[in-house]
């Protein structure tokens, strides 16, 4: 984010604080079918998750040729592969012979992929390199039996992919800059492409995939849900939001920001006095905190179940005990607050079938959560 834009955001925040105001939008309702209807859920998978890029891991997780991540994304098993020469590839994790998965979920080191069923063998570029009794398959030429590619790319410190097969004539290399829009320039400015993951987490979440984002697109809950963790750092129910299509950039001013009134604008740095949230639709969340960032992606597994992949990104791996403890404390602070949010989402999901509610409500300062749902509705034809 260029300095002139940082200054404009700080001026905007100071004006809201001075006027004891917050940015507001239209109140909205959210029908419970959004969280419980399996037919609607499949429309979300088809029209959203299989059409939009997702950040699936930091680039540094696949640092060397032969580094592989196997991960299930919206019902599609993927292989994200650092190939020879450093090229990033994405494939469906399924043998072209009889469909068996080549690798179990997780991070791997590999020189090739060997199917455990009949030993069909693929290179890191996805090409079929060998198969026993190859003469038995005149109807399946080796050149036509490479792994099925998916759109994928590496950009701005993350590995991105869309969980669907590349269509005929489609370039398998994603244009991530076009997808990120104007907020992509912020990520370039922060320099995430050289940062490394200090800690990574993966966990099951017994809630619809949308619930975690609702809680992270508003601050109305901070003084109550986070009263023992981060609430003291922030103003009550105050955020600033900008949008580019379905993407959000949300700024959460910290109480320390008022100290900037005593400094010349040339000395202002927004990252030191505010948290900056980037939500890249549909499911990638980046929290920039000045000297580090926290990122997570929520992947749906069923209408009432999802899985979270997250990491704390830092400029370089620490080598001293003091530095290790510093980054550990920052990561624990983030995940401690986030665990509070996720627990509340799980609690809400557990009441959906009780008959207590037919709709849920978003107030005027929860308008970013309402916009998120409006974008989902637009894309699935709701």
Give a label for each model feature.
Residues 50-61, 131-135, 278-282:
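Short Pro/Gly-enriched beta-strand edge/turn motifs at strand-loop
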Residues 5, 153, 158-382:
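C-terminal catalytic domain of Rieske-type non-heme iron oxygenases
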Residues 10-38, 100-114, 148, 228-262:
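N-terminal short leaders/motifs
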Residues 1-94, 98-105, 151-153:
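N-terminal pre-ligand scaffold of iron-sulfur
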Residues 61-178:
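Rieske [2Fe-2S] iron-sulfur-binding domain
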Residues 12-20, 124, 182-185, 269-270:
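Short, flexible segments with low predicted structural confidence
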Residues 56-64, 141, 273-278, 311:
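Short linear motifs in intrinsically disordered
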Residues 31-33, 57-58, 140-141, 175, ...:
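Short, solvent-exposed coil/turn linker segments
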């Amino acid at each position: 984010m260029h300095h002139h834009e940082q200054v404009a955001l700080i001026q905007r925040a100071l004006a809201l604080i001075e006027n004891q105001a917050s940015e507001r939008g239209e109140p909205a309702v959210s029908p419970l079918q959004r969280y419980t209807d399996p037919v609607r859920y499949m429309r979300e998978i088809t029209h959203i998750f299989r059409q939009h890029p997702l950040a699936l891991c930091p680039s540094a997780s696949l640092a060397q040729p032969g580094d592989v991540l196997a991960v299930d994304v919206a019902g599609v098993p993927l292989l994200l592969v650092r190939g020879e020469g450093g090229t990033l590839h994405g494939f469906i994790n399924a043998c072209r012979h009889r469909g068996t998965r080549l690798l179990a979920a997780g991070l791997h080191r590999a020189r090739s992929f060997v199917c455990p069923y009949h030993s069909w063998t693929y290179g890191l570029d996805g090409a079929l390199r060998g198969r026993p009794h190859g003469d038995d398959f005149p109807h399946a030429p080796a050149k036509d039996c490479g792994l099925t590619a998916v759109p994928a790319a590496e950009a701005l410190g993350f590995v991105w992919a869309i969980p669907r097969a590349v269509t005929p004539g489609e370039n398998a290399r994603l244009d991530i800059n076009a997808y990120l829009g104007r907020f992509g320039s912020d990520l370039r400015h922060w320099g995430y492409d050289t940062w490394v993951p200090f800690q990574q987490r993966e966990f099951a979440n017994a809630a619809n995939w949308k619930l975690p984002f609702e809680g992270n697109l508003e601050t109305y809950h901070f003084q109550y849900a986070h009263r023992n963790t981060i609430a003291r750092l922030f103003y009550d129910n105050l955020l600033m939001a900008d949008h580019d299509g379905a993407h959000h950039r949300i700024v959460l001013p910290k109480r320390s920001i008022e100290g900037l009134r005593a400094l010349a604008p040339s000395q202002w740095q927004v990252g030191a006095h505010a948290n900056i949230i980037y939500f890249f639709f549909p499911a990638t969340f980046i929290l920039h905190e000045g000297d580090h960032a926290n990122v997570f992606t929520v992947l749906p597994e069923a209408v009432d179940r999802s899985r979270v992949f997250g990491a704390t990104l830092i400029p370089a791996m620490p080598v001293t005990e003091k530095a290790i403890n510093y980054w550990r404390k920052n990561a624990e602070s983030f995940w401690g607050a986030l665990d509070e949010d996720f627990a509340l989402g799980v609690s809400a999901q557990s009441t959906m079938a009780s008959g207590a509610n037919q709709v849920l409500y978003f107030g005027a300062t929860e308008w970013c959560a309402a916009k998120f749902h409006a974008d989902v509705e637009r894309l699935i034809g709701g």
